[in-house]
Amino acid sequence: MINFFVDGQPIPQGSMKVINGYVIHSQGSALASWRSSIALAAKAAGAKPHLEPVEIDLEFTMKRPRTVTRQEPSVAPDLDKLIRAVLDGLTAIAYRDDGQVTSITASKTYGERPGVSVKVGAKLPVTLQ
């Protein structure tokens, strides 16, 4: 299992749009930069592409806007879109394909240091008796 933290405001991987026949992500360059940061942090932590099923734990920390008083970030960006960006950023770094991910635990909270804490490891096989 490898553990690492990626500094920076998490960027969601939103829907794709077709403009003039080209498919683009709604976040464009910000998303590409965020996924690159994820890949670099994973490599620095010693990630190697797993060949077996993997499990992932993600803890997103969002910067609380000054005017917000609620305790939980129950607004955009959607947690599933944040997860999608991380999974794509780890493809070919921590596993060959994100289809190998068979278990995900994820949460998002407010905090002073925005980013995502990532844990990736081989999923232990279940033994039947």
Walk through the language-model features, giving the residues of each.
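Acidic, proline/glycine-enriched N-terminal capping motif
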Residues: M1-Q129
